[in-house]
Amino acid sequence: MARIAIEYCTQCRWLLRASWMAQELLSTFGTDLGEVALIPGTGGVFRITVDGDQVWERKADGGFPDISVLKQRVRDRVAPERDLGHVDRRDSEHTG
């Protein structure tokens, strides 16, 4: 089972944002996840990893992830066969 780590900046007060994203991932992926960890950091960090592989980094990716984009990136690593329902359909409507 996958381990997700969300490292967030305590100085920036991003705990609420990090915990909401953790809740969304747990609600979506449930027992496909072994752990979702919140890791306090500093210096404007907001990084999300799946089993040590970075799937989002605030500075490199230009801000915070839209939750549907984050779910797709996590899904691609954790359960590629999973249909995310409206998240996948909404994305295909915008690209097609």
Label each region the model flagged.
Residues M1-G96:
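Domain-level signature for proteins that mediate thiol-based redox and metal-cofactor handling
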